[in-house]
């Protein structure tokens, strides 16, 4: 586990931003917790995929942040990108709803659930908690991940401009309270969570995908190609 949980796993741009965070006491406690969990229980994602979001989207490349909660707890689902599943894996209900809204909004129809190409285009697909015990949602909440991902968001707020933060659900909004003091530098799109329990309360019809590209176009930045390969 030690090799999977070192800062040199990250792109240099993230290492520079998070170097001080890595040595904080809560990170040592989190490392010890994860070492115990991975050695005794089934934990998702695989160790090498814990930081896939940061590996896929370097700090200087982030244009959009889509915040999730914690990884999917089912076997073979989580691979380190929020809301995403590996190629060939059945789409979870939240992702089905995301794709339904995407199709209604911009006419793009996706059938594969791997969102890697979105990450490659500058969308940081970040969960607020990066690991989970198999079959037990939120089982790794309150162990330090929230503090770490808050630090990631804070670095983006302070050291980047014109990032589009997409907040789906109350948990994402709470995580990004800092954003509401930084709206002059960043854009915020908020809606209900895409889960079946909440999607009809404001996720469907939010048009976030077209709004993201509208904002990027205004900034003279390349728009996102939402079609997955």
Curated annotation (Swiss-Prot):
UniProt GO cellular component terms: cytoplasm
Group of enzyme by EC: hydrolase
Active site: 70
Chief place of localization: cytoplasm
One Pfam family matching this protein: UDG
Keywords: Cytoplasm, DNA damage, DNA repair, Hydrolase
Enzyme Commission no: 3.2.2.27
Subcellular location field: Cytoplasm
Keyword Cytoplasm: yes
GO biological processes: base-excision repair, AP site formation via deaminated base removal
Matching InterPro entries: UDG_fam1 (IPR002043), Ura-DNA_Glyclase_AS (IPR018085), Uracil-DNA_glycosylase-like (IPR005122), Uracil-DNA_glycosylase-like_sf (IPR036895)
Keyword Hydrolase: yes
Gene Ontology molecular-function annotations: uracil DNA N-glycosylase activity
Reactions it catalyzes: Hydrolyzes single-stranded DNA or mismatched double-stranded DNA and polynucleotides, releasing free uracil
UniProt similarity note: Belongs to the uracil-DNA glycosylase (UDG) superfamily. UNG family.
Protein function: Excises uracil residues from the DNA which can arise as a result of misincorporation of dUMP residues by DNA polymerase or due to deamination of cytosine.
Protein name as catalogued: Uracil-DNA glycosylase
Organism: Chlamydia abortus (strain DSM 27085 / S26/3)
Gene encoding the protein: ung
């Amino acid at each position: 586990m030690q090799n999977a949980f070192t800062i040199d796993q990250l792109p240099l741009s993230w290492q520079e931003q998070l170097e001080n965070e890595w040595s904080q006491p809560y990170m040592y406690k989190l490392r010890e917790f994860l070492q115990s969990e991975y050695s005794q229980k089934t934990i998702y994602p695989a160790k090498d995929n814990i930081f896939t979001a940061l590996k896929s989207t370097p700090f200087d490349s982030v244009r959009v942040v889509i915040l999730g909660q914690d990884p999917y707890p089912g076997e073979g689902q989580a691979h380190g990108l929020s809301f995403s599943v590996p190629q060939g894996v059945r789409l979870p209900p939240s992702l089905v709803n995301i794709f339904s809204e995407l199709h209604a909004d911009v006419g793009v129809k996706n059938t594969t659930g791997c969102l890697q190409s979105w990450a490659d285009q500058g969308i940081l697909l970040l969960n607020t908690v990066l690991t989970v015990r198999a079959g037990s949602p939120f089982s790794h909440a309150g162990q330090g991940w929230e503090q770490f991902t808050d630090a990631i968001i804070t670095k983006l707020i302070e050291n980047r401009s014109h990032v589009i933060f997409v907040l789906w659900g109350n948990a994402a909004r709470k995580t990004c309270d800092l954003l509401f003091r930084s709206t002059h530098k960043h854009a915020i799109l908020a809606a209900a969570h895409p889960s079946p329990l909440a999607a009809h309360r404001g996720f469907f019809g939010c048009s976030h995908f077209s709004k993201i590209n509208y904002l990027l176009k205004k900034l003279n930045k390349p728009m996102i190609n939402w079609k997955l390969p």
